[in-house]
């Protein structure tokens, strides 16, 4: 399936649509390394990632294996497995990946060539991650991997996203969003009520002293 100018099948719940893509890093003395990521479209939560030495179909399927294991979707029978959204890179159009997706009951949507906006969420993830991770120099793949671990944890659990009501991806992914937003609204109402009371109290005191 190919996506049009604008992705017409937005997700309505977690684990309905997963975006996946590669981005690359160069480690002096080691060469190029490639980060394979699976991002939940609804929550922006990074479900799985791998630092790879190639961009092969097996790297993609290994990352998807990690994602299915993390969500335990490989252990339960569900009506619909996550739909995969990718670009048209060689690894994503390969027969090997098509066979893997069929075996795992997953459908696949590919963006229109030269139209990265279709995968805007994972592209923004790449930018946010590289803005932080590339501030340092890495001399070993393990150093880069350690920094990626830290940033993924921060991104999932501590970084607020304006596009999801200033919640973290983990808040949305684990279903805490509604409760957090309700709590914020209660705090806001109580704060406004307290400010009004303080204002009226000051005004009354001023009038009594006049």
Pin down the residues of each PLM region.
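Mobile-element integrase/transposase regions
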Residues: 1-39, 45, 62-66, 70-73, ...
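C-terminal domain-tail junction helix/linker
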Residues: 2, 10, 80, 95, ...
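A short acidic/small-residue loop/turn micro-motif
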Residues: 40-41, 51-58
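Hydrophobic (often cysteine-bearing) scaffold residues that line and stabilize catalytic clefts
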Residues: 35, 56, 60, 85, ...
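Mobile genetic element proteins and their domesticated derivatives, centered on retroelements
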Residues: 21, 38, 44, 64, ...
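Helix-centered, glycine/charged polyanion-binding patches within enzymatic domains
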Residues: 92-118, 122-126
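Acidic/histidine-rich, metal-coordinating catalytic segments
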Residues: 64, 76-94, 112-114, 165-170
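Short small-residue beta-strand/loop micro-motif enriched in glycine and branched aliphatics
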Residues: 45-49, 108-111, 135
């Amino acid at each position: 399936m190919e996506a049009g100018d604008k992705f017409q099948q937005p997700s309505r719940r977690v684990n309905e649509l997963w975006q996946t893509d590669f981005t690359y890093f160069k480690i002096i003395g080691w060469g190029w390394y490639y980060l394979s990521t699976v991002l939940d479209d609804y929550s922006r939560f990074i479900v799985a990632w791998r630092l790879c030495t190639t961009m092969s179909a097996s790297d993609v399927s290994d990352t998807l294996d990690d994602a299915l294991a993390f969500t335990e979707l490989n252990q339960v029978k569900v009506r619909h497995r996550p739909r995969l959204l990718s670009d048209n890179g060689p690894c994503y159009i390969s027969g090997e990946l098509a066979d893997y997706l069929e075996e795992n009951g997953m459908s696949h949507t590919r963006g229109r060539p030269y139209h990265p906006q279709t995968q805007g969420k994972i592209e923004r993830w790449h930018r946010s991650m590289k803005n932080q991770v590339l501030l340092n120099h890495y001399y070993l793949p393990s150093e880069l991997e350690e920094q990626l671990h830290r940033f993924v944890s921060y991104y999932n659990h501590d970084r607020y996203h304006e596009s999801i009501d200033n919640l973290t991806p983990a808040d949305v992914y684990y279903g805490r969003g509604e409760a957090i937003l309700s709590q914020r609204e209660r705090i806001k109402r109580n704060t406004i009520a307290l400010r009004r009371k303080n204002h009226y109290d000051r005004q009354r005191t001023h009038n009594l002293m006049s």
